[in-house]
Amino acid sequence: MCGILAVLGCSDFTQAKRVRVLELSRRLKHRGPDWSGLHQHGDCYLAHQRLAIVDPASGDQPLFNEDKSIIVTVNGEIYNHEELRKQLPNHQFRTGSDCDVIAHLYEEHGENFMDMLDGIFSFVLLDTRDNTFIVARDAIGVTSLYIGWGLDGSVWISSEMKGLNDDCEHFEVFPPGHLYSSRERAFRRWYNPTWFSESIPSAPYDPLAVRHAFEKAVIKRLMTDVPFGVLLSGGLDSSLVASITSRYLATTKAAEQWGSKLHSFCVGLEGSPDLKAAKEVADYLGTVHHEFTFTVQDGIDAIEEVIYHVETYDVTTIRASTPMFLMSRKIKSLGVKWVISGEGSDEIFGGYLYFHKAPNKEEFHTETCRKIKALHQYDCLRANKSTFAWGLEARVPFLDKEFINVAMNIDPEYKMIKRDEGRIEKYILRRAFDDEEKPYLPKHILYRQKEQFSDGVGYSWIDGLKDHAAKHVTDKMILNAGNIFRHNTPLTKEAYYYRMIFERFFPQNSARLTVPGGPTVACSTAKAVEWDAAWSNNLDPSGRAALGVHLSAYDDKQNNLINNKPVEFEKLIPMEAPSLGVAIHS
């Protein structure tokens, strides 16, 4: 993937304007250190900073169709590009890049080809035949994208806010799953899955369907011509990703080029829960494991850089982005260009600790829908920008469109957390990979309780951040915060500290409006705070705020899961038994 910048329909065609576009494009150079390009056609500029992963030798951008009448600059990975090429037999492709199909699909289908793309992407396509353009962003918003408008009537597009904030009168986050057409001068949502309406699904839970869909999501993301690895925290999600990758790597083209030995990476404070759990999983899977430690001071020293790169003042995002930012630098120094990661599972399966308080399956499901829709503002933002700060790409198989459709079509009663019945968070995901004949993971890892990333890297990390902020923000500053920051007023010294840094880098009103706000507990939406009256006055978004839920050890019923005595799920809800001959413990 890469960094893109486009200025469309501007009134200035001078050399000075070209120099300015190049200057702004260089603000995105960290996203694509391998190559840069700028194409001008009349009043339109398309700039690109490339991180070369597929066809690194010839896939430089912008990309064109045969007669160069269609021009595309894109940040993305199209996993089904080989299949799409076969559907375009009358087209000649100029490169082996996975994104080369976009211009040709547009020639065949006009603006109506977005659903055909299986992957993650943000792109600008210029049709020079009538000087029109379209802009599109992937379904969930794994890739970052912003849109802005200049006083001269120009439209600006950038992978990061820093590429356009100084030159636009107004700018905002480009909505995921949408297309912007210059013909209509409006957004149109192209991603319309059944779960988006938040209606309650009724399909029975099929553990094999969940397993196979997720394995497929992981395997398709092993498309590469460069070295890669897996982020491994030792929790359920990253461990499953690592297990599947390790299991299937030998059968992929990547193994022919880079070997079948998987490299795994973990970060944490010395002695943190994640380091210990990740080492155990790595030993079990036989990966080449790289363990990075940092101190609280290391993290504090990086905070300003993190806020500049991640472009947010959201507390939980900054807490979690900082260790990931530090780890990404180390990973890139080893020659690795991309990693596969476990973001998205908690949103899909209700894995956050506050889901224990969901009053019924309807509330549970609508909250998962809200969380998925907001991912581009939180975990996707973190995974994309904290890694790309060092030219490292993160791929997230849990956010595969097909997998989301399978998981979100399941009756949410199966996802409900019922501790008195031994059903912990994400039970149906755990059970789908509980294979006695060929285990994916050790039992105690498969049933390890959820840790927020910022907690798992070491509990003293958050405490250290709070202590540091308290040295820079006084009680008087907090009392007057509402007069200084009228939008998303910070309520804690830590939040105020981050906001001050953010405003220094991004002082525009449009910038502060790109960051979500509102009450939250353990990463909940504002609506879910209503589930427990005790949460209404909570100021700490950490998972530890969900008192009585986060346990240092499992109770007896949870221990039964680890000790080969899973809860008898089928007695709760009738369910079809698996029939494909794969051992699923029940």
UniProtKB/Swiss-Prot annotation:
Signal peptide: none annotated. One of its GO terms (cellular component) is cytosol. L-glutamine binds at R50, L51, A52, I53, V54, N75, G76, E77, D98. One of its GO terms (molecular function) is ATP binding. GO terms for biological process: L-asparagine biosynthetic process. Residues 193-516 form the Asparagine synthetase domain. PROSITE patterns: GATASE_TYPE_2. ATP binds at L231, V267, S341, G342. The record marks E343 as: Important for beta-aspartyl-AMP intermediate formation. It holds the Pfam family Asn_synthase. Coiled coil: none annotated. The keyword Isomerase does not apply. PANTHER family: ASPARAGINE SYNTHETASE, ASPARAGINE SYNTHETASE [GLUTAMINE-HYDROLYZING]. This is Asparagine synthetase [glutamine-hydrolyzing] 1. It comes from Lotus japonicus.
